[in-house]
Amino acid sequence: EMCIRDSWDNDKTGLITNDFNSPVINFKNLNTLTDYMAQEALKSPNGHVRHIILTEQGFTATSQSRGNVPQIQAAAYAYSYYMVDSNPYIDAYILSRQVDAPSEVRSGLSFGLWECSMDRGDDIVATKRRKIWQVFRDIDKKKYTLESSEFAKPIIGIEKWSDVVPNFRWKALEK
């Protein structure tokens, strides 16, 4: 199983590179995708870079090898949000689930901002907010953005967001 952490720590795999031949595009090398789309041959007829919408994105809060990992889920979201927010060619970033789906949870996937009731069949009934919910609520607010994502830096292994996020929007607020 690929660990959620691999999203920002997969230089070791050799699958994530910052060139157009990268076998995998993920949040760590997201700029490679938008740089690719900025090539002349791929621009719109009026010469503009085509913008991208990321849909059905998500990070699971459960891991078969590590159990319940809501802090890692929230850290992965914070990292991915900052990568998207700082890229002018990403128009939207849509998460897969607001609330876990019981059928997915039974398969080991817990993408929601909320946990779900597991005693209601496949009905999706929210029961408890996860850490990601608070990050989702506050990460785009100037007053709270860095505070809401501070917990994620040691998980990811960084001192500053601007060290890993190109054109980090909130760099002036960092200490």
Residue ranges and their predicted role:
Residues 62-175:
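Aromatic-rich peripheral "rim/lid" segments of glycoside hydrolase catalytic domains that contact
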